[in-house]
Amino acid sequence: MSRVRDAGCVAAGIVIGAGAWYCVYKYTRGRDQTKKRMAKPKNRAVAGTGARARAGLRAGFTIDLGSGFSPPTPVRAEAEDRAQDEASALDTVGAEAVAPAASSAEAQSGAGSQAQEADGAGVGPKAESVVGAAMASAIAPPPGVTEALGAAEAPAMAGAPKVAEAPREAETSRAAVPPGTVVPTEAAAPTEVTEGPGVAAPTKVAEAPGVASPTEAAEAPVPATPTGAAAPTGAAESPGTSGSPRTAVVPGTSAAKKATPGAHTGAIPKATSATGAVPKGGGKGVTRSRNGGKGKGKKSKVEVDELGMGFRPGDGAAAAAAASANGGQAFLAEVPDSEEGESGWTDTESDSDSEPETQRRGRGRRPVAMQKRPFPYEIDEILGVRDLRKVLALLQKSDDPFIQQVALLTLSNNANYSCNQETIRKLGGLPIIANMINKTDPHIKEKALMAMNNLSENYENQGRLQVYMNKVMDDIMASNLNSAVQVVGLKFLTNMTITNDYQHLLVNSIANFFRLLSQGGGKIKVEILKILSNFAENPDMLKKLLSTQVPASFSSLYNSYVESEILINALTLFEIIYDNLRAEVFNYREFNKGSLFYLCTTSGVCVKKIRALANHHDLLVKVKVIKLVNKF
């Protein structure tokens, strides 16, 4: 029996010595390699488990002592069971299990051998985490090294943020522990380690072994050193965001420690926004962010007005024009309640002038607030009775210049149709539109005159609009020469003087017409000549027209260089007056020299200039001239 015992002791000594030598070799070789290159993470398929590593060591150093003897069975300590249970629990929580590094395998093999030695020396079952005296003296790294033996290496995932704190085994004291002493152990809650001031951030901290855990990780029982022995916890911090510098707390420095919530009770600490995001695929039960999305955090803000003008960039040109017209504020129409759920205020929104209902944000979709258009209709849109009523109500209630202009344009375009001319009158829209000419804004006045001009094509509407003729004439004379208000106002008066019913209202304005005729541009001349032609066809207005003193420049309308349109209307006026002079006998004594009567007689200046137009290049003018010359 003594020989058998001696052989067993020899075998155990050989195994222990070989394991210690192998650990020293790997440790020193690993330190040399860390200075040269970064360690690459190993996946689960490449890296072997602790049991496989121990099996490899046993297979390499087994001594055949005969058929009656078998290699000594390693003693598995209770702490090792707990550590493996926790490692398996972390594997089930994480989406990708962390592969133990080569150093983990070596540490576990060394721990297995230490367990055998502890069995013979009388060390307790929790002695696995404490390195023996011989190994501690042989393997004594400096206290500033952050590599902790027995911890797994965190997987390096490109672009994925890492958890800053992970429960792992704390480094035991580097002091030599006398053999045969039982080291008391106690479970300590993981602490949140913060960097102390002046601590350098090593670039090789990613190589420091550490188990990367999900946001909520279970506590790991950490063996503690006896009282009086310094046991710094080498906690490595992983960056919370990609591209951040990696920092580590070096043991031996004065680093401030904050107790994690629940540390005094042993509760599982929950990661907050300060600890960084969970690595992609870090847990089977995916941790959701605060705003409900998966993975990356999503913005919860609705897009704001980037330009400060009351609309977003995607609202279209109409909104931009609306805001610019009112000093940088967008106009939203106040719409009356529609009857019987009628659409027209929100359902006419085009895709080009509005934001889409939802926008793509990562993997989720969030609603985007819809913004109403400044005006509910297109200005060239043909509306029905109910929509016309809404536009009239909007025009009457709104004090916004932009809304008033767009509403007047919409009504003006709809008034081109005879059916809508009657509809607007029946809806009481004539006074609403006509009152807009009292506005001081020339743009609003112009749009109102355009609508009145189109509405005046209806004879019944003329009876309602004739009360505004003198007001329009006053605005024409007060406006700038050749302005849009003058042109549109003269067009309205042209329609109102087609019949003889309301011409007498402008009898006192004939002299003003001749003044504008001599000073105005081409459009002004054309409209005034049409009005004077209407007066000339009315016998009651003819005498007043002929007795009016006209400027000497009136005869210049019949020169050959005058525009064809002006020339044709001037020839038409002369033809109407000449025909009335031939049909009716007038007393020359009733008219003063310089009046229109003397210019239009056979011996007048106009007749001589008209004869000179017989060879005019314009065919219509030439035909008109030939017709008049035959009457002379």
Swiss-Prot record:
Gene3D superfamilies: Leucine-rich Repeat Variant. This is Armadillo repeat-containing X-linked protein 2. ARM repeats lie at residues 376-416, 418-457, 498-537. SUPFAM superfamilies: ARM repeat (SSF48371). May regulate the dynamics and distribution of mitochondria in neural cells. It holds the Pfam family Arm_2. The chain crosses the membrane at residues 7-25. Disulfide bonds: none annotated. Keywords: Membrane, Mitochondrion, Mitochondrion outer membrane, Repeat, Signal-anchor, Transmembrane, Transmembrane helix. Residues 1-6 are mitochondrial intermembrane. Residues 1-6, 26-40 are annotated as: Mitochondrion outer membrane (MOM)-targeting sequence. The keyword Cytoplasm does not apply. Belongs to the eutherian X-chromosome-specific Armcx family. It is a single-pass membrane protein. Residues 86-120, 211-241 have a biased composition (Low complexity). PANTHER family: ARMADILLO REPEAT CONTAINING PROTEIN, ARMADILLO REPEAT-CONTAINING X-LINKED PROTEIN 2. One of its GO terms (cellular component) is mitochondrial outer membrane. Residues 26-632 are cytoplasmic. Expressed at high levels ovary, heart, testis, prostate, brain, spleen and colon. Expressed at very low levels in liver and thymus. Not expressed in peripheral blood leukocytes. Not expressed in pancreas and ovarian carcinomas. Residues 68-124, 160-304, 335-369 are annotated as: Disordered. Residues 336-356 have a biased composition (Acidic residues). Its main location: mitochondrion. SMART domains: ARM. It is found in: Mitochondrion; Mitochondrion outer membrane.
